[in-house]
Amino acid sequence: RTEGLARERAGGRALEALVHIANGARTTTEIGNRIGRAALSAALQLLVERDLATRNGTCWVITDPILRCWLSTIFTTQRSDPHVNSPTLRDRFERHIRALWTQWMQANARSFADQVVGLFQQFSDETVSLDSKTGRLPKFDTVRTQSPNTAVEGTYLVALGQGKRWCATVQEQPIDEQTIARFETFCRTQAPKPSRKIVISNAPLDQHAKLVAKAANMWVWEPNDLHLLMGLYGQV
């Protein structure tokens, strides 16, 4: 899919940016720090036009996992050592695939709440657009969970960092108006008052429950939002 990219205007810069995105550069600032800011906007726009990368807020992600894997293993290795032989390339690629598979298996063996905690622990001041809202994901010092009073209520999450407190309700069961109301009550017990209240569910929310959450100024993260974040932070 990258064939001919380097021959286009700003294509060389675009290819450099793409390689660094594949190797963990998530934000425009981070990409610029690695390759310089000259003609960076045009290079990144070319990646969007060629459907090689997508932008969300200040973050960039290669949505095709095969392309991302190829760039970070085969392509990067060939560029650093043009004389490397095919068996070595194949071995490195296979080891990378096995490592990704192991990571995926370990992640899916964890509870949904633990996966969300791991996600929060990776935030580092990136700006993203989720649920028709743009917001910054602070770097948190601590992320802890708390069990609600009822067994069916999922898990509450409290994240602290940069003088901010975020609270989230992490749900695997269907969310209704009462679930939102109990979470709002929990948030009112927090000191300092949470600067963000988030409803996180691995199933689509009922429209009425979503309206109630938005009326309480809560950020709603549904499955598509979580998939985007997991991809952005290399968990899918």
Where are these regions (language model features)?
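Winged-helix-like regulatory helical subdomains adjacent to P-loop NTPase cores
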Residues: 1-37, 84-85
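Short, hydrophobic/amphipathic alpha-helical patches that form generic packing surfaces
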Residues: 16-19, 69-76, 118
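Short amphipathic alpha-helical interaction segments
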Residues: 33-50
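Short capping/hinge segments at domain boundaries that bridge a core fold to an adjacent linker or tail
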Residues: 49-85
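Mixed-charge (Asp/Glu-Lys/Arg
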Residues: 63, 76-236
